[in-house]
């Protein structure tokens, strides 16, 4: 019984560690299919990402929380990088590397709801691209586009303009994962019900 109670309590702690139903909000943008000359097309398609947009007007989150960045792949002749002064990130990658999951963590930081981001792809010999610029693509769940991503993870691709603006955006692939600081109401309710159940079993055991 003690083991059962301990296991149940541990499960409730894990449930409580979940996050609210919050995520990234993408404003505007027309999505296009990821082209075949993107070296990571099949890898992105396997993640149900088959579109990308470069003409969006804003990207933000709808709740306070933490954003964690991971780098996943690079196909480019230039030394390219990703930076954010707010997150304290300034990473440079001189060599190509294949697509990797879960990827390598390159930094994280706390954000407020509706905060503006200072994320930027950089290139030693190409053209830098900040959020909202042509070289900075956001991969989408479908090629039809959406005004609200509604997801906790955003996948971003860079086109350094090294071979001209080919818009394949595989010169560096980075993801940003958002975790809300506020537990969702359903999780709080589950915790309450679970604790009540633990109390019931504990009382019943004492009575036996």
Per-region residue spans from a language model:
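Residues within well-ordered beta-strands of beta-sheet-rich folds
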Residues: 70, 157, 173-175
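Short loop/turn segments at secondary-structure transitions that flank enzyme active sites
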Residues: 127, 164, 178-180
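A generic structural signal for short, solvent-exposed coil/turn residues
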Residues: 14, 61, 148-150, 166, ...
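Extracellular carbohydrate recognition
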Residues: 165-173
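Extracellular distal adhesion/interaction modules in secreted or cell-surface proteins
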Residues: 23-152, 161
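Short, threonine-centered small-residue motifs that mark membrane-proximal processing/anchoring sites
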Residues: 1-24, 173-201
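Short beta-strand-plus-loop segments that form exposed binding edges in beta-rich domains
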Residues: 158-164
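C-terminal membrane-anchoring or membrane-association module
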Residues: 200-208
């Amino acid at each position: 019984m003690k083991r059962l109670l301990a296991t149940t309590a541990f499960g409730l702690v894990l449930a409580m560690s979940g996050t609210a139903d919050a995520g990234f909000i993408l404003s505007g943008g027309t999505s296009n299919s990821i082209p075949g000359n993107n070296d990571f097309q099949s890898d992105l398609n396997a993640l149900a990402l088959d579109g990308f947009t470069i003409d969006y007007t804003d990207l933000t989150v709808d709740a306070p929380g933490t954003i964690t960045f991971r780098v996943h792949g690079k196909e480019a002749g230039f030394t390219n990088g990703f930076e954010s002064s707010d997150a304290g990130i300034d990473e440079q990658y001189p060599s190509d590397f294949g697509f990797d999951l879960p990827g390598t963590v390159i930094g994280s930081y706390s954000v407020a709801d509706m905060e503006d981001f200072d994320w930027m792809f950089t290139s030693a010999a190409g053209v830098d691209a900040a959020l909202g610029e042509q070289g900075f693509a956001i991969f989408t769940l479908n090629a039809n586009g959406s005004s609200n991503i509604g997801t906790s993870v955003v996948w971003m691709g860079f086109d350094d303009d090294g071979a001209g603006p080919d818009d394949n955006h595989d010169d560096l692939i980075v993801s940003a994962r958002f975790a809300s600081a506020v537990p969702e109401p359903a999780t709080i309710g589950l915790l309450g019900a679970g604790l009540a159940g633990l109390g019931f079993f504990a009382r019943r055991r004492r009575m036996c």
